[in-house]
Amino acid sequence: GVGKHGTFNVEVAVKDGAIERINVLDARETQGMGDVAMEEISKLIVDNQTLNVDGVSGATLSSGAFINAVGDALTQAGADVSEWKTRAHAGMSDAEDIPTEADVVVVGGGGAGFAAAITAANAGKKVVLLEKLGILGGDTSLSGGEMAVPGNWIQLKQGVKDSPETLAEDMLKGGDNVGDPELVKVIAEGTLDSSQWLTFEGGVSWEHDLLFFGGHSVMRSIIPQGHTGSEMIVKLTKRAGEIENLTIVKNMRATELVKDASGAVAGVKAESQLSGDAHEFKAKAVVLACGGFGSNVDMRVKYNADMDDKILSTDSVGAQGDGLTMASAIGAELIDMQYIQTYPTCDPETGALLYVDDMRLESRAIMVNKEGDRFVEELDRRDVLSNAIKSQTGGMGYMLWNQAAADETGLLKQHADEYDNLEKRGIIVKADTLEEAAAHFEIDADELKKTVERWNQFAKDGKDTDFNYRADLFTIDAGPYYLNSYKPAVHYTMGGLHITTNAEVLDESGAAIPGLYAAGEVAGHKMGTNRLGSCSMADIYTFGRIAGDQAANFVG
């Protein structure tokens, strides 16, 4: 089959015309997402002996590809696949014992939701976490998971001087000083503790390296093992499963916040995405951690007309702004909604964030245009890069690096699945010469050679006089060469619910709504006009933990 990240192989054991078991031999799907979908679908197929089964919401591509792969295996076994696909339908069903009362209900099963739920549960409260998709993780799983952490252990080992104050300055400057300095201070001062919480409470493992994200003044971003946020979600899911007073309910979309007679939030109305049944979850406090609205084109256009359907998105299909809709319906204030970020280097066909282009963040690649020229400083802010790319021929940019960079960083081996997929689709090319690489994308080869020669001279001189490259300069002086195309896609919505430093949601008069808290991308006014890379992880785990703690305190 062909899933989101390339091909995978399955083994189907058939006896007397029935499937006995399904084994996934080789899969490159996102850990905690595609693999979970395949496991659940396997059970449906084997238990019901049919290929007429539902996919898993949030992993639609992986689901369809897996079902097709099982069908291919059945064909090889001599079965009539068309007959298997017309057998009685088998769908997933709700759990039989869904708890409808809790001390704290958390809406959203991404990083912020897990941080809030685990924190509140560890405080002794009964917690129910609702996730509308059939898989957990949201945008956290789809991200690289890198986390801005001043004073981290790698900085200390490498002698990098940094501080929470410096991170706060970078974040405020990176968002044109629109973000709330007090909220930014909370993130900057809390992210080191949050990274340690992930390590010791969550069991998250880290690479022994840092990335230099655009807009930061120093290299400070730690990297989860595997260079993916799914490392965090898989480990947090495991930890949550060990806590007796924490229940996770998937395929349950929260639709409405419930208030009691005093005006305090006292629960959530929800709808099963499987059965359509209505549920009400009574609670003494609610934490909204259900992400932004990057996948909701109508909401994007409502607040920023430029962000229409011509622009693809890196976000989870679940990023629909549900929390904003529910909270604003009871008077919560929305703030900074017009500020929508695009990530500069995304798959031009699907909008997916390109992990191989982290070569730029490893300070080993340059960005060029159709004319073969550099057009921006590669480590500038995301909005600066995106706007620069949009103004190039075809609204497209191209990333260039060489084999030495690939070998030294190990990035292509780390993301071999993505690389293979991109190569098959012609989005990336490996060539022995610059001329050959340029020809693949019809880039001006002579100008590209001049650009590389000029860049190599900058590296020797120690100064980029064109765009003032901020990291250590490097040469691209020998092949093979790699070149890939990319364009910006919607990645993050800076606007959201107005919150206090205690994660309390404010109403339009500026008063806190009793019993309602928010954390992560659903909460706004932290990033200003633009978010610096790796600050989202710092935010979601810091404010997620605060929201869980404050909700537990409110319950008493």
Task: Cite the ranges covered by each PLM segment.
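Active-site- and interface-proximal helix/loop "cap" or "latch" segments in soluble metabolic
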Residues: G1-A88
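Helix-rich C-terminal "cap"/substrate-channel and partner-interaction subdomain
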Residues: L44-D47, N52, G394-Y482, Q550, ...
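N-terminal Rossmann-like FAD-binding beta1-loop-alpha1 element of flavoenzymes
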Residues: P99-L129, A552
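Conserved N-terminal/central alpha/beta ligand/cofactor-binding core
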Residues: K126, I135-T247, N251-A254, A365-R374, ...
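Helical element adjacent to the flavin cofactor pocket in flavoenzyme catalytic cores
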Residues: P224-K284, L324, S328-I330
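A glycine-rich dinucleotide-binding beta-alpha-beta segment and adjacent secondary-structure elements
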Residues: E256, E447-N530
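Glycine-rich loop(s) and the adjacent beta-strand/alpha-helix scaffold that form part
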Residues: L274-D277, F281-D347, I546
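An anion/pyrophosphate-binding glycine-rich loop and adjacent beta-alpha core
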Residues: L324-M326, A332-I443
